[in-house]
């Protein structure tokens, strides 16, 4: 029987040489995960990191002198991961990362958290991006694990922010922030450019600014997906938002003068984010005291916009429950506005820098969620 196009291609010597060279140039990828008292979520996180279509070449987990079962859980995977322990609790995520960085050997460094699950193709996606030698860092896509109304609102926020704002930032070649639980860097550049200054409470934003200051290329990959735990209590939510806003103001002060001189257009873009935040927060908090009717009209108009985006986000994220997010989300924007103004006064007006890290309560995670 004759089969059309049945010729079997033969590999020439030059072809074999090219394949060998390609294999020799294969980038090695390391994972760095700081963890402190993560007994409820750590095992699921480790399993997700191990179950990759393209395995990590090295997995480094830094136990920041935990007092729970974290060391015991890490010991269960001792033959598959590198588990190290700080001499004493640093009380700071970036300090634990800095300690763990000394053990990292890969060409590419991936950072995530002990309360985060990686999509099985996360490493595969990251590897594709770094095939471009000009790419220095990759920002991944963050999903909020479902738990209650707070995480539902956060899921809504993530979908809109990452499918609209971050896509636009990627188009303009100015990613605003690398997510701490879904980022990857060329290791040597991370060591020499990013560094750990420990002078802001949001090190991921500090790293991003430093890369921009040195004209390094950051890209956004929506297919490099992670699933993270967000605060499940209002108390935890407020602490996280206070940290994010405080860290934002700290990094604005730290890097703004340099950005103004070297990248004036980007300085304008950066300023607009904070100016818009101040204007919107002031509008929400002050208008009710000036004219209740105007405040009501503003909220009705805003509610219509939120409903439209919620419908789109529910479809985009394949999460129908997001249709229920607008009502509690409107409650949260007042809390956000208050915290934004509070941190502005503390960090910019009074200049009382906050560097205290608050660790939210964790809940158990399931691999079936991804």
Residue ranges and their predicted role:
Residues 1-48:
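N-proximal low-complexity "stem/linker" segments adjacent to membrane-targeting elements
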Residues 27-30, 58, 206:
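Cell-envelope/extracellular polymer assembly enzymes that use nucleotide-activated donors
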Residues 42-44, 68-76, 97, 121:
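Acidic helix N-cap motif at the loop->helix transition within catalytic regions
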Residues 47-56:
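Short, acidic, metal-binding catalytic loop of nucleotide-sugar glycosyltransferases
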Residues 57-65, 84-86:
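Short beta-strand/loop segment that forms part of the nucleotide-sugar
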Residues 85, 92-96, 106, 120-194, ...:
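Long helical/loop segments within the catalytic core of UDP-sugar-dependent glycosyltransferases
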Residues 109:
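Short aromatic/hydrophobic "clamp" motif used to bind/position activated sugar donors
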Residues 272-353:
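Membrane-embedded multi-pass helical conduit in multi-pass membrane proteins
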């Amino acid at each position: 029987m004759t089969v059309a196009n049945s010729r079997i291609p033969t590999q020439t010597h030059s072809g074999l040489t090219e394949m060998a060279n390609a294999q020799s140039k294969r980038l090695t990828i390391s994972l760095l995960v700081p963890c402190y008292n993560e007994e409820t979520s750590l095992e699921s996180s480790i399993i997700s990191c191990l179950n990759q279509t393209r395995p990590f070449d090295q997995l480094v987990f830094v136990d920041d002198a935990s007092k729970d079962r974290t060391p015991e859980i890490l010991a269960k995977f001792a033959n598959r991961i590198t588990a190290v322990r700080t001499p004493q609790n640093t009380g700071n995520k970036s300090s634990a990362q800095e300690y763990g960085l000394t053990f990292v050997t890969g060409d590419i460094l991936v950072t995530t958290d002990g309360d985060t699950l990686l999509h099985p193709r996360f490493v595969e996606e990251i590897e594709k991006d770094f095939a471009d030698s000009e790419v220095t860092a990759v920002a991944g896509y963050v999903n909020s694990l479902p738990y209650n109304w707070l995480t539902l609102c956060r899921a809504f926020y993530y979908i809109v922010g990452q499918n609209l704002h971050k896509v636009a930032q990627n188009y303009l070649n100015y990613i605003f922030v690398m997510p701490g639980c879904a980022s990857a860097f060329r290791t040597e550049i991370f060591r020499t450019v990013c560094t750990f200054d420990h002078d802001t409470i949001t090190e991921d934003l500090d790293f991003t600014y430093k890369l921009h200051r040195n004209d390094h290329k950051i890209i956004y990959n929506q297919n490099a997906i992670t699933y993270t735990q967000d605060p499940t209590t209002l108390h935890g939510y407020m602490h996280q938002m206070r940290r994010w806003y405080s860290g934002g103001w700290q990094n604005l002060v730290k890097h703004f003068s340099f950005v103004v001189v070297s990248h004036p257009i980007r300085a304008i873009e950066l300023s607009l984010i904070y100016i818009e935040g101040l204007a919107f927060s002031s509008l929400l908090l002050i208008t009710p005291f000036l004219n209740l009717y105007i405040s009501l009209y503003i909220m009705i108009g805003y509610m219509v916009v939120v409903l439209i985006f919620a419908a789109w986000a529910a479809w985009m994220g394949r999460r129908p429950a997001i249709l229920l997010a607008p009502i509690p989300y409107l409650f949260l924007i007042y809390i956000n506005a208050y915290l934004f103004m509070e941190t502005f006064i503390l960090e910019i007006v009074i200049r009382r820098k906050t560097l205290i890290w608050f660790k939210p309560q964790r809940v158990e995670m399931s691999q079936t969620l991804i």
